[in-house]
Amino acid sequence: GGGSGGVRAARMAAQRGARVALAETLGTDGLGGTCVNVGCIPKKLYSYAAHYAEAAEESHGYGWEGPAPVLNWPTLKANRAKEISRLNGVYSNLLRGSGVTVLNGFAHLQAEHQISLSTLHADGTPGHQTFSARHILIATGGTPHVPHFVGREHVITSNEIFDLPDFPQRLVVVGGGYIACEFASIFNGLDAHVTQLYRGEQVLR
């Protein structure tokens, strides 16, 4: 895994003289895991964008005049992607500078000290490589899970919401945890009509 934990562990081990390889599927997401690609960092960028709308509204009381600003969703998405790509490169350079070999592929535990790496060749055909090590650290992180129910095809998770083709004018957020509250707040600030559903009496419990 090439998230925050895997990258840090790989660098620390390499700096102490170990020969280290890190396996990560580098497709739509790069190094850095959830936090960098679909978590903390992009959420902060979108949160900042939402704050500007409120600041613009308050500015009239301080003498600022002119038409209200309009959100350009494609620009926000493009600038977010640009910043995430920059951070992916920072992680890559840190690993390279520490002497870590990055393996692009999906790793499967094959034996106690062995993994099988599933890769795709340039022509699209699948490939497999085997690697052995005295120590194998599992730092795979997690992904959102959507249960099976009628209408499931209309559901997105916190992973997909950053890159929707069109800005959602109406949004229903299910849940009362910090991720749900953050996105409800962000998209409300970006001027979407947001409804938040929660089965309990108090959010953020």
Located regions from the model:
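N-terminal Rossmann-like FAD-binding beta1-loop-alpha1 element of flavoenzymes
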Residues: 1-22, 173, 179-189
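Rossmann-like NAD(P)H-binding beta-loop-alpha module
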Residues: 154, 165-199, 203
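Glycine-rich flavin
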Residues: 12-167, 200-204
